[in-house]
Structure formats: structure tokens, C-alpha cells
Curated annotation (Swiss-Prot):
It is an enzyme of class 4 (lyase). This is Enolase. Transmembrane segments: none annotated. Keywords: Cytoplasm, Glycolysis, Lyase, Magnesium, Metal-binding. It comes from Doryteuthis pealeii.
Amino acid sequence: MVIKKVHSRQIFDSRGNPTVEVDLWTDKGMFRAAVPSGASTGIYEALEMRDKDAKNYHGKTLFNAVGNVNKIIAPALVDKKMDEKDQTAVDNFLLALDGTENKNKLGANAILGVSLAVCKAGAAAKGVPLYRHIADLAGNKEVILPVPAFNVINGGSHAGNKLAMQEFMILPTGAKNFTEAMKMGTEVYHHLKSVIKKKYGQDACNVGDEGGFAPNILDNKEGLELLKTAIANAGYTAEIEIGMDVAASEFCKEKKYDLDFKNPDSNPNDWLTSDQLADVYKDFVKNYPVVSIEDPFDQDDWEAYTKMTKDMDIQIVGDDLLVTNPKRVQKGIDLKAANALLLKVNQIGSVTESIQACKMSQDAGWGVMVSHRSGETEDTFIADLVVGLCTGQIKTGAPCRSERLAKYNQILRIEEELGDKAVFAGKKFRNPLK
């Protein structure tokens, strides 16, 4: 089997911004992939190529990236007669075609669109589901269904409220299977809506980019209190734990942390040191069932990460810190600067490098959480990815907004297809392969 034709176009993501879509043809038919886009992006991410033409879509058009697929990548791939089943060979060819460290010649969004489409075509060529093909690529004999981490309260760069910390998540680790985890998550979500409406009014039930509620609160502890109440009201206090994505790089100023960063007149005397912020997290963990904190410090504050990972017995997830980049993941492992990787395919820009970063993390005993981006599409690739890579945890928003539910619904279908062979990560979500 060989790749016969590749075509790219500009479509729109869930925030109404242009993004890249790629169609790829083989003898088995046409395979389509769409590329997501982030809001709180780490400075070390691979280059998302935008045209920066201020007169068009606020500078966010992608005609150069699309052109790179159609004029450079497509003819090269077709001419090479590459086998879509050999993901590593195709991705290495794409990386060589670009030839830069952070994919700034062709664009990570151009390369990733092709890489994702190739992966889907490879599964079809083998006659297996996508998650099985991904498991094969990763060398996994098993597949595991993940615990969903529902982002039900949005703050930070994902919402127009005063909340500094970006995501407050619920993890139904006590569920028996993925279907039950969805039941718990959706029921708590609706209870949370009632709690927020009663306390803050109907306006507070507006949702952020990822489907979570965005009440106009300033105190991060209040966000945790709302979750605790909603979980109790749903009757799942024993089954549901809490995760957070702080996205601290977004409010780091002069090596301090401003929890009132959305206020242009915030008081510098109130800004916190790394140690003071770590004490805030310790208080959260002491008073709430918080089991996972992502990006607790700035993406260059390695020392603070190492200290917190040593001091606290919870999952410390590196997102902006590691940007799914195998080199930065290795640095994180060497410095013991985290104990989990947030895996975002568009941060690094190819399926092969994503698998490499995942395997490195798992081999070091780390957890891995597969993640969407705030600017998403209806593409469900990451649902199959999380099952095939056996990471045991996925965050892809609240159980609200179709671009989020598309992923959760795909995992439900996979669970149904696996039948009595389905294994759910549950309480072992941090290291499900052990």
C-alpha cells in the first residue's frame, strides 16, 4: 500500500479560528485529520505556523501551512511511494523535509495534519481499529481505557472571569468502567451548574472554551469548594477526586506569581514566591481530594518543580514545562522535576515523537495524561491515542460542547467494541500498566 494523494485546506476550530485539515488517499480510501490549537501555549512548543496578516482573521490564517502541505509535503510523499503503515518512516521523512528543530520551515500544524492522517490510513491498511494500530506502534500488547479528567470550572486564559488558575477537574477514579465514569462526570456537571446558579446567578453558568463553567470568582479555593459541594450533592464523594491545571506561566511576573493577574492594577506586594505558591498547593491537597496538579510553576522554574515533586505525594504534571518534547522530558526525568507528562500531539507535531515522549515517561515510572487543546475540532484521534498508549488518563474538557464530547463518545464506542476485554484504569490511572 502507498500514499496516493494528499490535500490540505483551512477549516475552523471550536473558537472560530482557522486551523489545518488534511485529507490523504490510499487504496483503502480517504482519511481525514484536523489539527487543534492552544490558548495557553508554552514558549517551547513546536511552531504553529500562522500567516500574521492582520487584515485576515486577526492574523490567524494558515495559507502558508496549507500551501506547505499541498506544494511541498504532498508531492514529496507521493513521489516517495511511502507505506502508510510505517508511521516512523513517514514521520522521519517529514521531519527531514522540514529540517529545523521546532518545525518552523513547514509548520508543526502542517506536519501534524499529515502525520495524523497517515496514522489513520495505516490502521485501515492493517485492517485494525486505530487504537490497536497505535498500540502496535508503541509496542503495547494491551489497551487500557482511561479515567476522564473533566474540566468543569474554567479560569485563566480559558475564561473571561477573575480566576487565575485555569482548570478545575473531576476524575471519577472510583468508577468500575468508562461508561460509569461518564455517568458520574455528567451528573456532577449538572449538580455543579445548579450550585453555581443558586450561589452566583444564571450568568455564572456561562461556559468557557472547554465547556466548563466560568463563574466570576477570584478565590481559587472557592472553585475547589464548588466542586466539593457538587460531588457531595451527586453522592460521589468516595468515587471522585480532583485535578487542577494551574497554568502558572500565564501569571508569572518577575519570577513571582500574581493570582490577580487579570486585574491591570494588581498589587505587586501580593505576588507570591514559588515557596509561597507551593504552600497554597499544600493547603489545597490537605483540605480537598486533589490528586493531580499540572503546571504549578512557570515553565522555566525547574527548581520549584523539583522541590514540589519531592515534597508532595500527588501527581505533578508537566505541560508548558515539557511541551511533549522528548529532550525536555529527558531533562524533567533527570531533574525529577515532575512525575507525569501532559501529552499534546500538536506541541511536538508528529505521532512518532508523541509516542516517543510517552514511552520515555512511562519507562521512567511517570504518569502520562493525554490532552486536547482549547481550540479543538471534531477529530477524535486522541481518544484512540489514549487507549492505544495505555496512559490511563485523558483530559478533553467538560461533558459539554460537541468538540469535547466527540472524544468521550469515541472512547465509549471503543469500550463497547472491546466488550469483556475492556480494562478501565480506575484508581491505577497514574500507572495503569503496573
